[in-house]
Amino acid sequence: MTKSRAPKPPSDGTHPALGPLLTRWFFARSVHEVAPELIGATLLFGGAGGIIVEVEAYHHTDPAAHSYGGPTPRNQVMFGPPGFAYVYRSYGIHWCVNVVCEPEGSASAVLIRALEPTHGLAAMRKRRGLDEPRSLCSGPGKLAQALGITIADNGLPLDAAPFAIHRRTTTPEIVAGPRIGITKAADYPWRFGLKDSRFLSKPFPR
């Protein structure tokens, strides 16, 4: 069986090294294992992106998960196989990108909340209409806009172009805390981030 490969674009940031491409098997595990292991990985879309510094886990038994009430046309990708992108619109304004995890039918996913921009900064600045790197991808809606991700990318595989997620090359120090912007199960400590990162959407409680 041939392993999935994706071209490694040159970096225009400070982190040129990329690990191997994550395959769908990586995402076929518990969402609680996958979420913290995504911290430090590099998410690229069409050659633009950066280091994942913040995520949130959503399990199918979780009242805050879109899949909690069962399958709908909106969330059907969550009920499919792992390793695919689940894209939805938040508050009718922003697109958000998630990675589907666990075996098919489990309907669990990890929301990518923030990136440290490292690749394709010129394209991301143009899409966002600003220059400050810390503001390009410091939130799920911001990063989707910066990368150019929309509903047209819902259901695409994460191990094939235009997506690529590269395994982290070091073991980062990770912090955890309550998720943001939800009212149900708001106390679950299922938000994970890179300790002391300047690119988080919001600092973690100390």
UniProtKB/Swiss-Prot annotation:
It comes from the Bacteria. Its EC number is 3.2.2.-. Keywords: DNA damage, DNA repair, Hydrolase. HAMAP family: 3MGH. PANTHER family: DNA-3-METHYLADENINE GLYCOSYLASE. Belongs to the DNA glycosylase MPG family. This is Putative 3-methyladenine DNA glycosylase. The lineage of its organism: Bacteria, Pseudomonadati, Pseudomonadota, Alphaproteobacteria, Hyphomicrobiales.
